[in-house]
């Protein structure tokens, strides 16, 4: 089925069993908030992105599942760094999803552009930049697999804002069966 990147993201979060997501809205992620409003996922609004990251970390510690935090571009994304570092040091599974400037503006010092991929590299297990809506589902599934396997820890998924509005074919994940 043909869906926009934001809806693909939210569907993948539901596939992973995500029931709560922590965050603070911003312009680059408004499409995600529109998709979340039509989903089964509960958004927990915090007063600051750092608080959202620590709340997601606390959720992960308590539930044993990866916590999920959502932040906008620029200072919204950089506000996650302390929480990501804490999750990294304590091996807490976390998936941090950040919006960024539109793809064509990356690398041009655009308003609120921060290279959060490189900034977060020392304090994450892995980072992914989603460059097309068709990459969204594989990126989210990989982020959860990496966050929750081996030495657990935070994984960053950075998404240029226009990718949330681009469409791509989405196929739900096939559940794995165990005997």
Where are the model-predicted features located?
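N-terminal alpha/beta PP-like core and its mobile active-site loop of ThDP/TPP-dependent enzymes
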Residues: 1-179
């Amino acid at each position: 089925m043909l869906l926009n990147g934001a809806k693909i993201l939210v569907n993948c979060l539901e596939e992973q069993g995500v029931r709560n997501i922590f965050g603070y809205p911003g312009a680059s992620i408004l499409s995600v908030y529109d998709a979340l409003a039509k989903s089964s996922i509960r958004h927990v609004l915090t007063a600051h992105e750092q608080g959202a990251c620590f709340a997601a970390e606390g959720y992960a510690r308590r539930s044993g599942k990866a916590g999920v935090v959502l932040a906008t571009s620029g200072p919204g994304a950089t506000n996650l760094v302390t929480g990501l570092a804490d999750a990294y040091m304590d091996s807490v599974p976390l998936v941090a999803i950040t919006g960024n400037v539109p793809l064509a503006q990356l690398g041009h010092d655009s308003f609120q552009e921060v290279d959060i991929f490189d900034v977060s590299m020392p304090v994450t297990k892995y980072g992914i930049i989603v460059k097309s809506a068709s990459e969204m589902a594989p990126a989210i599934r990989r982020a959860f697999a990496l966050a929750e396997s081996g030495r657990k820890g935070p994984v960053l998924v950075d998404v240029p804002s226009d990718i949330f509005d681009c469409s791509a074919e989405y196929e739900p994940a096939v559940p794995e069966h165990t005997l």
